[in-house]
């Protein structure tokens, strides 16, 4: 029996592309056996696994414009541009404004792996679904802690940074785990080559406190580019389906505009049309 995995690589506000993909999948009744989430992609997948259609869209297009969610004020006050405790605690807990349906999340047999980077030694950490607990989404926060923009997030006594600096496109991980086909959701153009330049300045800052993680950040461009090339190789073999936006609509990791968010969501929704044929081939 064919086993299918899905990967959402995250990408800050660009990651709303994946929300569109997953909402279309929920409408079409498409399930997968395993979800691999990186950074914001991990958060997207919690709603997908809980089958909460439209929940992610509300976070990106409504809550994200609140200063409590992500702002320079939050950075200067809490040393975190994105207030992870507000997003994945205040809003998401059972008594929050838009709680995750934890019972549905837990009951769904779909597996879930969350990628993070150990801030102390730079090692890749793959958290299991079982570490997502009632009103405890710490591994999502850890996977989303963008270096320098956020402090490392501590889980079980260990500090972690964003999974995107450790294993940004975990296609090889999914295949090694035994999945035959992989749906890969990107939030950059599929042929975009990452450049090292933009990571050098934050890596120099990070090096003062977390040198191993800084080296991971410094080399992220190569890790991402190499993993994406590998994904394209597997795509040519029919084992991977790459879904990616054709335009970023003015969005980046920490920059947003309402029109761009809506366009990215719609493009993700439309891109999901390719999934049934891929799974049936």
Language model: regions and residue ranges:
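Patatin-like phospholipase
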Residues: 1-38, 46-281
């Amino acid at each position: 029996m064919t086993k299918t995995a899905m990967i959402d690589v995250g990408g800050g506000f660009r990651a709303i592309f994946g929300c569109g993909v997953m909402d279309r999948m929920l409408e079409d009744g498409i399930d997968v056996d395993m979800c691999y989430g990186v950074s914001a992609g991990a958060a997207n997948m919690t709603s997908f696994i809980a089958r909460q259609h439209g929940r992610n869209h509300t976070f990106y297009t409504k809550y994200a414009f609140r200063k409590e969610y992500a702002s320079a004020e939050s950075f200067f006050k809490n040393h975190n541009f994105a207030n992870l405790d507000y997003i994945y605690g205040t809003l998401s807990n059972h008594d929050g404004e838009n709680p995750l349906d934890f019972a549905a999340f837990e009951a769904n047999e779909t597996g879930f792996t969350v990628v993070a980077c150990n801030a102390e030694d730079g090692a890749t950490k793959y958290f299991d679904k079982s570490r997502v607990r009632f009103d405890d989404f710490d591994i999502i926060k850890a996977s989303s802690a963008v270096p320098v923009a956020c402090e490392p997030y501590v889980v079980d006594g260990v500090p972690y940074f964003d999974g995107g600096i450790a294993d940004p496109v975990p296609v090889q991980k999914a295949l090694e785990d035994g999945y035959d086909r992989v749906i890969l959701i990107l939030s950059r153009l599929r042929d975009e080559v990452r450049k090292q330049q933009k990571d050098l300045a934050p890596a120099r800052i990070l090096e003062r406190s977390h040198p191993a993680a800084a080296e991971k950040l410094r080399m992220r461009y190569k890790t991402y580019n190499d993993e994406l090339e590998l994904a394209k190789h597997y795509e040519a073999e029919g084992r991977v389906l790459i879904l990616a936006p054709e335009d970023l609509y003015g969005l980046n990791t920490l920059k947003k505009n309402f029109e761009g968010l809506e366009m990215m969501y719609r493009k993700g929704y439309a891109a999901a049309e390719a999934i049934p044929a891929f799974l049936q081939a």
